[in-house]
Amino acid sequence: MGRGGDSSGQAHPAAELAVPSDRAEVSNADSKALHIVLYGKRVDVTKFQRTHPGGSKVFRIFQDRDATEQFESYHSKRAIKMMEGMLKKSEDAPADTPLPSQSPMGKDFKAMIERHVAAGYYDPCPLDELFKLSLVLLPTFAGMYMLKAGVGSPLCGALMVSFGWYLDGWLAHDYLHHSVFKGSVARTVGWNNAAGYFLGFVQGYAVEWWRARHNTHHVCTNEDGSDPDIKTAPLLIYVRNKPSIAKRLNAFQRYQQYYYVPVMAILDLYWRLESIAYVAMRLPKMLPQALALVAHYAIVAWVFAGNYHLLPLVTVLRGFGTGITVFATHYGEDILDADQVRHMTLVEQTALTSRNISGGWLVNVLTGFISLQTEHHLFPMMPTGNLMTIQPEVRAFFKKHGLEYREGNLIECVRQNIRALAFEHLL
């Protein structure tokens, strides 16, 4: 399954970042010099603004900031080797530049990654991936067949489609992180991307829309002003025990801790509209993705003919399942400002901004392994089937370095989010 070639690193070369962003973000600011700090060197990345598959926004976020751990998280050893030439031409970072990657914790984290590589935890897991793929495609297409052919209960068919689309999102996420097919970069990047685009078509989301959001989220999780995933205003304002925020809530927002759970049901519809708008604003460049979306909705209209009344139920259930899971693992956690993060290792930032959903293997499968959010953010290129295996070592690592390993069952995680929204006790 794509074995051979460069399979020892966490990811793929710079030209094939796992989660590319939107090139349209590059504007007249192209001429501004951009420098990031890698391995203690101040590297000029200005010329990569238009060609960097991860987008130029990450360069601006990490301007004169240590990006070593983030760079290694999404690039292979081959790409790191390619960077050596630029490092030799680069000057040392200013003496006052924080270098968390060179701290004892940073070095310990790098050693842990190397142990995982040596143990084969980055190797592909074909049976796991086949199982997950079957959980997506079988209910989706079986449900569509039931609806179109009039076999069995239309409600049952609609529920199966909703369940398949729900799991489809998590599986597409894995492929687009390039954590499924491993081996020769030239082959497996294309295979992972092709699978991701196919799954995007099946569920009706544009891949480039997802990438534009997700790329930045991973490298600056819960960083105020940089992470697009935590921009939930005006619908939800996370107070997090701050009186200054509580006092600014309007009359509607003062009910947010009550409508938080129900509002998860509209997320699928919201994301679909956002995805369509994202593509529409980038035509004709994104014509292929626009045609894929048109084809998806044409097929849905054909399949659900005579049962259109079930479509709201499909999107409500899918949105609720996805939203309640995603929000449980990040949104109620710490929000960090850029100055704080400059001094943090990737592990420290992850410890403050991620929360796992406990419950074992079944919960992991039913949440697309996003329940292991901490491990996923530390090792985004690792096949999800191996995240449970390394969990005890990650716990021990956190304990060794005095970090809190945050987790709870789904109900506890939802309560954590509600507490972060509460405000009455601050007035």
UniProtKB/Swiss-Prot annotation:
Family matches, as PROSITE patterns: CYTOCHROME_B5_2 (PS50255)
Keywords: Electron transport, Fatty acid biosynthesis, Fatty acid metabolism, Heme, Iron, Lipid biosynthesis, Lipid metabolism, Membrane, Metal-binding, Oxidoreductase, Transmembrane, Transmembrane helix, Transport
Enzyme Commission code: 1.14.19.-
EC class: oxidoreductase
Region annotation Disordered: where it falls in the sequence: 1-24
Cofactor(s) needed by this chain: Fe(2+)
Positions with a binding annotation for heme: 52, 75
Recorded GO MF terms: metal ion binding; oxidoreductase activity, acting on paired donors, with oxidation of a pair of donors resulting in the reduction of molecular oxygen to two molecules of water
Topology in the lipid bilayer: Multi-pass membrane protein
Domain Cytochrome b5 heme-binding: 36-84
Signal peptide: none
Annotated InterPro entries: Cyt_B5-like_heme/steroid-bd, Cyt_B5-like_heme/steroid_sf, FA_desaturase_dom, Fatty_acid_desaturase
CDD domains the UniProt entry points to: Delta6-FADS-like
One GO biological process term: unsaturated fatty acid biosynthetic process
Domains as described in the record: The cytochrome b5 heme-binding domain acts as the direct electron donor to the active site of the desaturase, and does not require an external cytochrome.
Family to which the UniProt record says this protein belongs: Belongs to the fatty acid desaturase type 1 family.
Family matches, as PANTHER family: DELTA(5) FATTY ACID DESATURASE C-RELATED (PTHR19353:SF19), FATTY ACID DESATURASE 2 (PTHR19353)
Protein name as annotated: Acyl-lipid 8-desaturase
